């Protein structure tokens, strides 16, 4: 697996954990845009840890620290929007 493929798999995994834990939700109209649901990121860490431990051999991460750092990084990159900025822009226009 190439570095780019590994990074993509880690990103997909982290965003999946953030969404499945309820911390982020994808915009129904804009692919790749997420809405922050106002739930503490600790929920995502707990959920991610549970999934990681149950499937450690299938995880795209070398260790727990790498996994939690990746979840945190993508939360900071995609979180923080109360609403989809693209949907809001269309309403304002």
Curated annotation (Swiss-Prot):
Superkingdom per UniProt: Viruses
InterPro entries xref list: ea8_5-like, ea8_5-like_sf
UniProt protein name: Protein ea8.5
